Amino acid sequence: MSNSLFTLILGLALLPLLLWAYTALPRERWQIIAAIPTQKGEADGCWHGTNITYYGALLASGSLFGAISFFLFLGALGVPRWGIIGMVLGVMGCSVAAAKLLAMAVEKKRNTLTVGGAAIIGLLSMPPAVATYNSLAERLNAPLVSLIPVMAALAVAYLLGEGIGRLACLSFGCCYGKPLSELGPKTRRLFAPFAATFHGSTKKIAYASGLAGVGVVPIQASTSFLSVAIGLAAMYLFLEGAFRASFLLAALFALGWRILSEYFRADYRGEGKFSAYQQMALLGMGYCTLLALYGSSDTGSRTDLGAGLAALWNPAALLFFQALWLLLFIYTGFSTVTGATLTFHVRQEKI
């Protein structure tokens, strides 16, 4: 299969899912998957429950899609499975921890996450991960890998994962845009046909800003669509061996969009007109530019799409993906900011 055909097929496969999600997920019914009864109330006899959310399922699925993409790209470079799994676990472990710690530091809230902050930590932690892999590879007679191709793989995988993972924000109603009424006339006309409207009192946009039922800038859908579109373009460059161009396109877009998109958001992201997240993104753009200019890239590196696909179709890889999704879902899927009150009864007509 040619690289262009693979890119086209993937894009066409994702498009219907994205278009459906942009219209369906802001509805009230797409927030809670299930509720688990945990404790029975003594006063009213009702059960109190913990909610399992689509937010967790979608965020885990987006992260998994990014991990699968990264696995495919490094497999196409000839990196053995043990090396790929090690880099995924190392970088993702740092990023997942940073997603909560950075959000707590910036927003002063315990029950929140920052994907943008996690991305910065991922970019910073990958060079040590590559150095560690190469050190082990020398001892084990495994292929060595240059830094820039791996950074390109990471940046592209992040964008593709972000495109799916951002759908979680549509389900929960977080990371939401400004009301159209707060925009200037020209900007309002631009966004009006695509405005997002969220429903349900347990959506974050409702309880944090009182904007349920109000048309807002579709910032989550815009981020998702652009991330997938730019990610696919950068993926094609990667598969064609243009690693520096792929890395710069994916990384600079992801970080630059973080800076720009915040001007259209209404949710709290810390104090100041230029938020801490925007500052981190700006520093990240400089870091990525310097890395692309001076980082090592073997000009003889070639990708083999068939080898990458073959690396995915392996029991060890498949079990790893299943375990990764389950762990991420458990970590993010149990709601700490919503609750449930449950009652049970016998259906007499079925007896």
Regions found by a protein language model. Give the residues of each.
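Hydrophobic, membrane-interfacing alpha helices
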Residues: 1-351
